[in-house]
Amino acid sequence: MIREDEPAIIFMDEDARRLHHSHDDAIVITLAIANYTTRRVLIDNESSADILFYPTFHKMRINKELLHLTNVPLIGFGGTKVLLVGTISFLVMVGSYPRQINKEVNFLVVNYSSSYNAIIRWPTLNSLRATTSTYHLSVKLPTKYGIEEVQGDQLAARECYLAMLVVNEQMQTMNIEERRTLAKQIKVLEDVSLVESNPGKFTKIGSSMREKTK
């Protein structure tokens, strides 16, 4: 419940003066996750799951056996199927002393190549009573010591975006090469009769096979 004496969260023009305009950048911030300073954390108001990418988890040097295995599929991340390694709960610290909030967050750990280290979803933002502004690249949330602002890193957001474009382009190129290889294989198939007296019975084999093998 919001107290009547709690200050309102507002965004002003001066909050955006530090940014380069105009922009369509995402909100990318730094959080303390499991006591590790974690940069390149994407704030996603549309994501339904808190994501921690496995390379980041690995760098934390946390025992993999602490992960809880789950059968929940994650089949639509960035339009690509991803491998769900497991789930784990970490304490996340938002803000800086004294206006900081500690929150236990349950992460899905996924094995996927990403320029981000983690993604924070909208239910977690709601539990923090956080308000975001994509124009100001800012997250503000109430604390008992006043309103805390976590500013987005515009440069990091642009670097992550460009890096993801490269990854997506590489994946598309791989898919195109796979289709070309498959098409080439189909073209070199030829009909071979199984029974000489019955031309209707035949199979398809590669035309590059040796005559004796045929």
Show the residue positions of the predicted features.
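Short linear "hotspot" motifs
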Residues: 1-214
